[in-house]
């Protein structure tokens, strides 16, 4: 459903400015006449990407996959005419900040916000997205280019809190695999949840009382993916099917040596990070359902 205000018609987008596509040639970029933006009368860096609006059905899908709500603080990097921030405010009461380096886009966004009646919920800043503080954001939306997404990735990991959501229209984040990818009328949407940092050595305790068993758990982390081992009594199990989604952790401990008892050694763990400890429930193996807890250190 379209929101009840009109966006300026973009009929000249293919003739008046560069367009963002999956393939942008150097010749196409050079063909654009770019007028430098100014701040306080001083020239600033020109836009890395020239404005092409995200279709409204894609906007709505991006907000839906991120489960945007009035509790969120949404930052749209390269916000163009402000439609993502304004739609979130209009539909969900979300407070939002649009960042764009191009002064005409900022002016247009403010007019659109006023027309939509959401000026009390949204803010538009003329700024370089790479110099923008993202620590208050719980949702970040993007429609940039693959090279810019990859350049932005370290900043997202440095400033966003675990559990924050990132949604990109059209372009991925290099080797940071999306948690979810889908298409809306032929347009790709990529979605990530910022993972907590859980790599390192842990003392893992499964069960309680006389049935408790302790493992030396060692985890390696690549973005949201985990690998590792758990050792107890000289026997080592491998960490399989493991990932981190925000502060939630799931993994399986599996006996990779084979044999008749291997099927009894597949234990499925689900838990959450709370401070410096992991805790949750485990099922499978030869002990049935139980609770588990892990604290930093090997426990040896």
Where are these regions (language model features)?
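S-adenosyl-L-methionine
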Residues: 37-72, 103-136
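Conserved class I S-adenosyl-L-methionine
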Residues: 71-80
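Conserved SAM-binding motif I beta-strand of class I
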Residues: 95-100
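A short SAM/SAH-binding and catalytic strip from SAM-dependent methyltransferases
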Residues: 134-152, 157
């Amino acid at each position: 459903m379209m929101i009840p205000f009109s966006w300026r018609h973009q009929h000249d987008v293919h003739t008046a400015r560069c367009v963002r596509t999956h393939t942008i040639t150097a010749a196409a970029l050079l063909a654009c006449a770019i007028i430098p933006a100014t701040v306080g009368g001083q020239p600033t860096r020109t836009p890395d990407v020239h404005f092409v609006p995200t279709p409204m059905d894609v906007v709505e899908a991006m907000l839906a996959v991120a489960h945007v709500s009035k509790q969120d603080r949404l930052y749209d990097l390269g916000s163009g005419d402000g439609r993502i921030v304004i739609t979130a405010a209009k539909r969900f009461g979300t407070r939002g900040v649009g960042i764009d380096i191009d002064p005409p886009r900022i002016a247009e966004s403010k007019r659109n916000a006023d027309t939509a009646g959401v000026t009390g919920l949204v803010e538009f800043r003329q700024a370089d997205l790479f110099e923008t503080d993202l620590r208050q954001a719980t949702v970040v939306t993007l429609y940039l280019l693959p090279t810019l997404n990859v350049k932005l990735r370290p900043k997202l990991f440095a400033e966003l809190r675990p559990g924050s959501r990132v949604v990109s229209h059209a372009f991925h984040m290099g080797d940071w695999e999306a948690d979810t990818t889908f298409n809306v009328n032929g347009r790709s949407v990529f979605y990530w949840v910022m993972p907590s940092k859980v790599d390192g050595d842990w003392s893992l305790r499964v069960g309680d009382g006389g049935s408790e068993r302790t493992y030396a758990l060692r985890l390696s982390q690549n973005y949201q993916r985990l690998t590792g081992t758990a050792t107890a009594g000289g026997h080592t199990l491998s960490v399989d099917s493991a990932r981190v989604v925000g502060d939630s952790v799931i993994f399986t401990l599996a006996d990779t040596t084979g044999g008749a008892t291997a099927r009894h050694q597949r234990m499925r763990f689900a838990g959450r990070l709370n401070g410096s400890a992991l805790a949750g429930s485990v099922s499978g193996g030869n002990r049935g359902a139980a609770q588990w807890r892990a604290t930093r250190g090997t426990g040896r």
